[in-house]
Amino acid sequence: MDYQESRAYQPGDDVRSMDWRVTARAGYPYVKMYEEERERPVMLLIDLNPGMFFATQGAFKSVMAARIAALIAWAGVANGDRIGGLIFNGKHQELQPRSGSKGALHLFRLLVQSTDPEQGMQASLDHADSTDSTGLHSALKRCRRVAKPGSLIFILSDFYHINEDIKGQLLRLRQHNDVVAIQIVDPLEQSPPPSDVYGVSDGEHNGILDTRNRGQLVSYTQWCSEHHDSVAQAMRKRAIPLLHISTTDDAASALRQFMSSSLTSTAGTVSSAATEKVAL
């Protein structure tokens, strides 16, 4: 609630709102009048750890995350909300929510620097934690401290290494805010590639995937399915809406459809009408 003005006391006014300074000057009781805050804080938590600099088709996950963040930010600006963000890539780049286009433009500058194919990836590797879960866990923990209760929070990640600590942070964050999870996936994580031998890397470790081997193919398919189900179950148990966006998707179309169908009550602050004003 924001202070608006003080006026003369009227019978029935809450005495807890007395403006004692004005009362002392005027010699007559005055009360403070408040106006409900209209600008809702919108926070974007963006995962740019090494594994996000990956795609077999379409755009890198990191680039897709930046596109989605831009769409949400401009939709928030169009709706009169305050835009802030937290980019985590081994280090945290934090932007407190700001009104108008300033907050969005500041966020975009950080995203351009952080998603550069060479500089962004190298910075992510240089500051990478021992596990990506550490980065997501600390980002969620930090967001709980800085986010004003009632904020609308979007988490953009592939959600690998999700664990019980992260699930606990999600629950605590959800208790006082509206939270939306956006999982960015590559087609390779939805179905195995054609039968062959492939070199694979997460940016830090290298390996071989032989889909000609029946055992490896089954294990790989099962691993992908289990990860998908684990993330979906974690979000469902905490009443957090979950959107899957592929690196080959049209981000604007997927986001607009999701907002119009799934977020009518939870995240109506950023409406589909506002999203339609944005084009990447």
Give a label for each model feature:
Residues A8-D13, V22, V31-R67, W74-L280:
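Exposed, interaction-prone extracellular/peripheral surfaces
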Residues M1-Y9:
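Intrinsically disordered, low-complexity, positively charged segments
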